[in-house]
């Protein structure tokens, strides 16, 4: 589904003039940073919709031709930089007209909204007034302000850099997992499980994956460590899948990593199709309190929850090194596959 930015015009795309009316070309001045910001957002796959209140178009105080000349100039200016608006909605009424189309009301967009499927969670209203925030609330989407203290650069950071995060709480009779990921943050992860070696392995995934991982996990270790490791893998897969959103612009594919005498190879495809093939032989039953049979099971559970194809092969003689190499290489593969380097969805199907 579409990710839409509903963008105000005056005070957001162009500076608001002293008399609050853009009716001559000498009043037109772009807001600081708007061009590079919109180019970044356009590259990230967002659709632009302009929605603006223009008081009294067609009246003596605001002749229609004065509005049209300035409006076309603004559109041509953005178009010259490769920035296009899919739709433009202008309310020409005054507040006294009590119309159904003036923001924060949504009447102007009703026909469009009925015909257009869009992802509300990934859509925003960007504007400079309280009415824009009310408009966002009425649409059921997010809101970001434009002001002297909240710039277009901050808007881009909020939408793109902070968007790829998710939290999962998984509580069963066997385990309690509280996990969150932020894919575009390299803060030091905080991971707490009752199996120190497993904690260390997850730290490797986050560190080499280049993302922030917060995890609090507990479970019925008096029975077996199986449930804890399995449910953690499921929660991690669900969180990464959710944080990726529509997967627009990701590499999708991703790695080979040596560790001393051990070598681990991972091929990953975040395709929406779950499959896991693990090749490796462990002759020890446990390493650091973690059953070695749970290593392939971790990857199988992750693959299922993430919706990814994962092939992994590991060789070596030191089991600690072999397992650590597996988790490190998983992190590197996720970093490569989840990174945004394209301005398209990497699939001929149009969906992942």
Curated annotation (Swiss-Prot):
Q: Which cofactor does it need?
A: Mg(2+); Zn(2+)
GO cellular component terms, semicolon-separated:
cytoplasm
The active site is formed by 8, 10
Q: Where is this region: Histidinol-phosphatase?
A: 1-163
Catalysed reaction(s) here are: D-erythro-1-(imidazol-4-yl)glycerol 3-phosphate = 3-(imidazol-4-yl)-2-oxopropyl phosphate + H2O; L-histidinol phosphate + H2O = L-histidinol + phosphate
A single GO BP term for this record reads: L-histidine biosynthetic process
Q: Where is this chain's protein located in or outside the cell?
A: Cytoplasm
Primary location class: cytoplasm
- MF (Gene Ontology): histidinol-phosphatase activity; imidazoleglycerol-phosphate dehydratase activity; metal ion binding
Q: Which residues bind Zn(2+)?
A: 91, 93, 99, 101
For this UniProt record, the keywords arranged alphabetically read as follows: Amino-acid biosynthesis, Cytoplasm, Histidine biosynthesis, Hydrolase, Lyase, Magnesium, Metal-binding, Multifunctional enzyme, Zinc
**What EC number(s) are associated with this protein in UniProt?**
3.1.3.15, 4.2.1.19
Q: Where is this region: Imidazoleglycerol-phosphate dehydratase?
A: 164-352
Which residues take part in binding Mg(2+)? Answer: 8, 10, 128
* One Pfam family named in its UniProt record: Hydrolase_like
| Metabolic or biological pathway, per its Swiss-Prot or TrEMBL entry | Amino-acid biosynthesis; L-histidine biosynthesis; L-histidine from 5-phospho-alpha-D-ribose 1-diphosphate: step 6/9; Amino-acid biosynthesis; L-histidine biosynthesis; L-histidine from 5-phospho-alpha-D-ribose 1-diphosphate: step 8/9
Instruction: Give the similarity note.
Output: In the N-terminal section; belongs to the histidinol-phosphatase family.
Protein name stated in the entry: Histidine biosynthesis bifunctional protein HisB
Species for this entry: Legionella pneumophila (strain Paris)
Quick one: which gene encodes this? hisB
